[in-house]
């Protein structure tokens, strides 16, 4: 038996040697198609334990590929995961054998090589940090990519998504959810499901549902909600937004306003749902939470679910992972402009202006992206003619769980109020951690797109995976003088990427609601706003009180119905001391 085991190990090693020497995938490791769907009938049987040979094989492969065991299981599209409903042929025809790989980067040479190879092969960079880069590509292209990379990168990658078509298919609302919407609608007054979550946030919603939902909120809560139009898209659609606040009569002072936007990149569905969740939570909690009431009395909030309606609709109808808007370019077969690379401040489109097929194409000129131009003109008009003072801007994206502050285009110079930007960002990160124990990293936006800057000290500019000029973050901060501007990249850290399961909608919304509450407290001043009352914000509706009342039904003295958990109650000990000292922001503002 011992001799047999030794021979088995040698056989596996002999078969595995080509894997480490040849930069390519084996079809056995990354199947083009998932296994047949399991039976729909309740004939479940216990899974047989793994045999000695199977466990030995898995261990050897994991060690050869340097893949931690926990990363080999429960992955989207993992070959051991049998889909209940296999992806239709149309999705497989569009996405083929695409996978998503994560490359671990350690030095400038690796970053430069990866950036150059991605540009040469027109690859889709999903996300990047100072430690890793996620890239979507076809399995057939993997050997070509690895052949352009140094040897250190040829073995420092792992698959995040093995079967992109299946993962995309699973990201769309299920047929059961669609049936629920057809029967119950999407009214905020709809009875809650068994988990007390409003049905609107049980799944991602198409634009055709979001707009009527916004109108309904406006009609139900007209005393504090208005539906406004930011501008028009390339295809002629309105860019709707909700303006929330309690407007005092005859107040000559400029109204302090916070802008929260999402969906600049069409495929980032979680950003759209999160904007809606935070807006809904502020609206419905106004009469039940003194902190929310004070916040809406001091500030107006502008919530823009998606700056890119054309692209968002396109992700629902044609291509789930489309990024740009849908306007024409010089190449008819490569439409679209990246709406977060087309803003006028430090626009660096000269480098990529001749490549409309790039996922980060900024257009031929600053503000070539129609929706970004409309947004900027609306913002300027608000300050010039509508007595508005923008005090904060939050641009929601996905993914990688990062809180970024200016500047994006360069790490030099530092923003004038760097200390305050960092202080508030750290406070937001703490609020998120106490909400659902998720960790968000805080950094300058330039560092978030550069590799290992803290590890490698050099006077030379560090190479970048993506272009970073022309961002909305920098424009609002510099040109519009919005002192507290942030880009927040939401869940997750790459297990699903842009295809985040619907179960994450409510937890992510809870995290960003508390982030907005911390932002409001910081802007109001510690004495003016007071500590957040976590217990007040975390109440669930009592039995029989599942309906959300409209303006005419609200009882100012009843605070029992607040509909959501905004904090993980398993972390009580950590939160009890938080109001006393950890939440005590140091008042170090630079006047």
Curated annotation (Swiss-Prot):
A molecular function (GO) term: zinc ion binding
Biased composition (Acidic residues): 546-559, 573-582
Record keywords: Cell wall biogenesis/degradation, Disulfide bond, Glycoprotein, Metal-binding, Secreted, Signal, Vacuole, Zinc
A Pfam family it matches: Peptidase_M14
Compartments where located: Vacuole; Secreted
Positions annotated with a glycan in the UniProt record: 350, 381, 386
Superkingdom, natural source: Eukaryota
GO process terms (BP): cell wall organization; proteolysis
Residues reported in the UniProt entry to bind Zn(2+): 265, 268, 397
Ranges where the Peptidase M14 domain occurs: 203-523
Matching InterPro entries: Peptidase_M14
Cofactor needs: Zn(2+)
Residues making up the signal peptide according to the UniProt record: 1-21
Start and end residues of each stretch annotated as Disordered: 533-591
Propeptide: 22-175
Residues binding substrate: 265-268, 323, 340-341, 398-399
CDD domains registered for this protein in UniProt: M14_CP_A-B_like (cd03860)
Cited SUPFAM superfamilies: Protease propeptides/inhibitors, Zn-dependent exopeptidases
Keyword presence, Glycoprotein: yes
Location, primary (coarse class): other
Disulfides per UniProt: 334-357
Family: Belongs to the peptidase M14 family.
Function: Inactive carboxypeptidase that may play a role in cell wall organization and biogenesis.
Protein name: Inactive metallocarboxypeptidase ECM14
């Amino acid at each position: 038996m011992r001799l047999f085991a030794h021979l088995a190990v040698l056989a596996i090693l002999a078969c595995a040697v080509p894997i480490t020497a040849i930069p390519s995938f084996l079809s056995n490791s990354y199947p083009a198609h998932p296994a047949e769907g399991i039976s729909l009938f309740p004939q479940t049987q216990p899974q047989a334990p793994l045999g000695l040979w199977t466990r030995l094989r898995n261990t050897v492969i994991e060690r050869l590929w340097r893949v931690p065991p926990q990363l080999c299981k429960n992955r989207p599209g993992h070959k051991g995961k049998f889909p209940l409903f296999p992806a239709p042929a149309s999705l497989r025809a569009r996405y083929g054998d695409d996978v998503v790989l994560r490359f671990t980067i350690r030095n400038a040479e690796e970053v430069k090589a990866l950036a150059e190879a991605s540009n040469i092969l027109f690859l889709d960079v999903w996300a990047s940090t100072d430690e890793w880069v996620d890239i979507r590509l076809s399995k057939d292209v993997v050997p070509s990519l690895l052949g352009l990379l140094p040897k250190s990168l040829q073995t420092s990658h792992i698959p995040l998504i093995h079967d992109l078509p299946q993962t995309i298919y699973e990201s769309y609302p299920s047929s059961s959810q669609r049936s629920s919407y057809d029967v119950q609608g999407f009214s905020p007054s709809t009875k809650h499901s068994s988990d007390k979550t409003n049905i609107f946030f049980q799944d991602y919603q198409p634009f055709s549902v979001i707009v009527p939902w916004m109108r309904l909120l406006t009609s139900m809560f007209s005393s504090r909600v208005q539906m406004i139009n930011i501008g028009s898209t390339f295809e002629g659609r309105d860019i709707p937004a909700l303006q929330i606040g309690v407007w005092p009569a005859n107040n000559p002072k400029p109204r302090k306003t916070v802008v929260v936007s999402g969906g600049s990149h069409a495929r980032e569905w979680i950003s759209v749902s999160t904007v809606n969740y935070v807006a809904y939570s502020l609206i419905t909690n106004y009469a039940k939470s003194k902190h929310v009431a004070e916040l809406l009395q001091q500030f107006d909030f502008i919530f823009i679910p998606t700056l890119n309606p054309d692209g968002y609709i396109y992700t629902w109808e044609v291509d789930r992972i489309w990024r740009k808007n849908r306007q024409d370019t010089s190449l008819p077969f490569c439409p679209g402009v990246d709406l977060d690379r087309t803003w006028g401040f430090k626009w660096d489109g000269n480098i990529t202006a001749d490549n409309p097929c790039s996922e980060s194409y900024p257009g031929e000129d600053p503000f070539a992206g129609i929706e970004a131009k409309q947004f900027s003109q609306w913002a300027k008009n608000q300050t010039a003619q509508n007595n508005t003072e923008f005090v904060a801007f939050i641009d929601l994206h996905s993914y990688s769980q990062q809180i970024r502050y200016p500047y994006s285009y360069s790490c030099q110079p530092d923003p004038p109020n760097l200390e305050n930007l960092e202080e508030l960002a750290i406070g937001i990160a703490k609020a998120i951690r106490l909400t659902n124990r998720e960790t968000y990293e805080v950094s300058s936006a330039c560092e978030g797109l550069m590799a290992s800057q803290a590890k490698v000290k050099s006077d030379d500019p560090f190479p970048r995976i993506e272009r970073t000029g022309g961002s909305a973050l920098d424009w609002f901060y510099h040109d519009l003088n919005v002192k507290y501007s942030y880009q927040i990249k939401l869940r997750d850290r790459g297990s699903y990427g842009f295809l985040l399961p619907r179960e994450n909608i409510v937890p992510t919304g809870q995290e960003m609601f508390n982030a907005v509450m911390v932002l409001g407290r910081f802007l109001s001043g510690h004495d003016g706003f007071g500590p957040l009352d976590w217990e007040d914000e975390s109440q669930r509706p009592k039995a029989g009180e599942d309906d959300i009342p409209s303006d005419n039904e609200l009882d100012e003295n009843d605070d029992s119905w607040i509909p959501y958990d905004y904090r993980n109650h398993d972390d009580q000990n950590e939160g009890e001391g938080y109001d006393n000292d950890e939440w005590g922001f140091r008042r170090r503002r630079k006047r």
